[in-house]
Amino acid sequence: MQNKFLICDDCQAVNCKSLERKLKKLDPEAEIEIGCQSYCGPGRRKTFAFVNNRPLAALTEDELMEKVEKQLQKPRDPEEEERLRKRNEERKRRKEEQDRKLKEKLAKRKQTKA
């Protein structure tokens, strides 16, 4: 089964370019998805990546890579990965819904002020 890494290009603590290079070096065959992962709270303070739908975070990129290596050595459970994938999708959906509502609210405020 191919590994999958999800990394954020928006969070303050994540250096997307260097993290992507390190992950590619670790597993050249892995799928890497870059974009908002709706993991903003931890992403402000720690660098993180989702490894096969499991979130991993650390204070430094090197510490994170150690955790990623350990995670890749563990046996994979397809049912658990599917459960985590669904949870991640739901988290992203909720964030998108919140963002949409906030934009609508701001647009209404602009209309009432005009």
Swiss-Prot record:
Q: Which family does it belong to?
A: Belongs to the UPF0741 family.
Region Disordered, as annotated, extends over: 67-114
Q: Which residues form a coiled coil?
A: 78-114
Keywords carried by this UniProt record: Coiled coil
| A Pfam family assignment | DUF1450
Q: Per the record, where are the segments of Basic and acidic residues compositional bias?
A: 67-105
Q: Is-annotated flag, keyword Coiled coil? A: yes
Q: What name has this protein been given in UniProt?
A: UPF0741 protein Sca_0247
Reading the lineage from the top rank, the first entry is Bacteria
